[in-house]
A protein has these predicted regions:
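Conserved SGNH/GDSL esterase-like catalytic core that processes O-acyl groups on lipids
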Residues: 20, 26-29, 35, 131, ...
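N-terminal secretory targeting modules
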Residues: 1-145, 150-151, 156, 164-168
Length: 254
């Protein structure tokens, strides 16, 4: 966490889902710095007072606010359990020294340490879109928005630098989806995981509590993806934008 706070809530998003997602249980706790949590900090999260919730396709929702004191520099663990077969279409892959998680079989939301035989490390984050912290009014959020470049490590290093050298009033968060472009998106199963175009993503993803600045690193895939149908039938030269189209796409963000 990059800010001190007294309570938090999470946002779950089924943006790309084709069907409802049924969450059975969610918890939050302070991480032990490895593959477990500090059990005395474990707090169940609720949704309108209920342990579970259904997220309709294309929708998102927030948990109830939970009393959860945090200090700047603390690492927390949010655990989600889905008892039913779940379509995992809404998620992103992120890497970096501050990013990562675990995928596990069964309900391990209250486990102090994950069972090594039924869990594995992952860089894919499903459904968890935001973690809001109740903090001082003068604090703010900076959003790093982009594609695979931003899904990699540099936002984490910016977070570390901000924690070390900042004034303690700014949180840095990441909104990145690998393979995405500003102007176009793929309409085939081969590149379905490359996600939505910026025009679709941006208005939704910048709706973050306390955000007043967006740092954009986006557009390289618009340029490098088209290679001609003789090389890749899904990447025609007609997808290559003009300079004017790219400028107009970036102006949409502004």
């Amino acid at each position: 966490m990059m800010l001190d706070g007294s309570a938090l809530r999470i946002t779950l998003d089924n943006f790309c889902g084709n069907e409802p997602v049924h969450l059975t249980r969610a918890t939050v706790a302070v991480s032990d710095g490895a593959d477990g949590i500090l059990p005395e900090t474990l707090v169940p999260l609720t949704f309108s007072g209920n342990a579970g919730v259904t997220i309709p396709a294309g929708e998102r929702l927030q948990s109830d606010a939970a009393a959860f004191p945090v200090e700047k520099g603390t690492t927390i663990a949010v655990s989600l359990y889905f008892a039913e077969f779940t379509e995992m279409r809404s998620g992103v892959v992120i890497t970096g020294p501050l990013s990562g998680g675990y995928f596990a079989v069964g309900d391990q939301t209250a486990n102090a340490v994950l069972d090594t035989d039924t869990s594995k490390k992952t860089h894919t984050v499903y459904f968890l879109s935001d973690i809001d912290v109740l903090t001082a009014a003068e604090n703010r959020t900076l959003i790093c928005f982009g594609d695979s470049i931003t899904a990699q490590a540099w936002p984490d290093y910016l977070m570390e630098r901000t924690l070390q050298c900042g004034d303690g009033t700014t949180a840095v968060i990441r909104k990145a989806a690998s393979g995405t472009r500003i102007l176009r998106q793929y309409d085939n199963i081969t590149y379905d995981s490359y996600g939505l175009k910026g025009e679709t993503r941006f208005p939704r993803e910048i709706q973050v509590a306390g955000a007043d600045t967006v740092l954009i690193q986006h557009g390289i895939n618009d340029i490098i993806h088209p290679v001609g149908t003789d090389v890749n039938r899904f990447r025609p030269w007609s997808d290559l934008p003009t300079a004017a189209e790219m400028i107009e796409g970036l102006r949409f963000y502004i």
